[in-house]
Amino acid sequence: MHAFIVPPKIVTGPGCIGELGTEASRLGRSAMLVIGCKSVASAGGTDKLRGQLTAAGLTVEVFENVHPEPPCQDVDTLRQRIKTHGSDVLVAVGGGSVMDIAKAAAILAFSDRPTAEHVASQRLPDRSLPMIAAPTTAGTGSEATPTAVLTDKSIDRKKSIRHPELMMPKVAIVDPELMLSCPPGVTAASGADAFVQAVESFCSKITTSLTDACSEKAIVLTARHLERAYRDGSDLEARQAMAEGSLLAGMALANARLGVVHGLAHPIGGRFGVPHGLACAVLLPYVLEYNRQVLEASGKYARLAGLLGTDPVRFAWNLLKSLDLPSDFRTWPVDRSLIPELAEEGMDSGSTKANPRPATRDDLAALLEKVL
């Protein structure tokens, strides 16, 4: 038996952020508005969002202190603000980090224990606050996943927490107009993450016909429109396609998981500060080559080539060039002596466990030797 978990309600299309007040008023009366995108705040977006919520009868508190790869301490700060304000619904408008911190705060809102303890023990409360997610980047697809990735700064490690029901946003509002001001560099890295998630969820060893349907469409949408969105951020058609592709990839990975790319991207990001999307983009061609034999045997490699219109490994290399991204991490201040530890962390990842080709610690170390 397979359960297919998605947000109860998904609203999409240009201008659909205008439904925010209506949707929030159905879930609560006191909103914690979590904002992370500087372009939203600088364009007066925070005031507009607050205005929609207050017009719908909600009181509003704004939380803007969101860092990339959010640390557990930031979740603790947000949880305290939620208690002080008496918030009964979270509204997250931003990229993947905003979604992560909001989902973590929602599930831990009723706990008195530090976030880091919950992350370490993987024990979560049995109730949460409802949440609305409105992405400002096409990337993580977090508006459609029940997972939050957090950084424990005390050990420089990224770990995820997951609850299939209590951490899934109640409403996903996916408006491409929120993404028009996303800078080219962020568009490239986050969009590459969306593409990689579509590919890895398609190649996962625990796919179903439903996850394949989502990931296949996501692959086509992101492969065809990512460079367009990168070259011209005002291209609404490309932004819409990327928004839908990211959403579908999120729906796929929420149910099929991912693979070694994400299994290694998290420790690389946690240890060396490499942005998550960039880490995923760089790792993809190496991991596709690692998985090639198994994917060819299953027929997935040929199906992926059909979706892309070319050899998948070649496409992954060309994607890096088209987005002006590096082919390895050697320009970053990485410490190669940590490769054994990074490989160990990769082995602990649920993403690695879903990889189509089983991986050993030595396999992961060999991949890391190539990219670091």
Predicted regions and their residues:
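Gly/Pro-rich interdomain helix-loop hinge
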Residues: R271-L338
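Glycine-rich phosphate/pyrophosphate-binding beta-alpha loops
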Residues: G139, L247-C280, S349-K353
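Buried hydrophobic positions in well-ordered alpha/beta secondary-structure cores of metabolic enzymes
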Residues: G13, L33-V34, P71, G96, ...
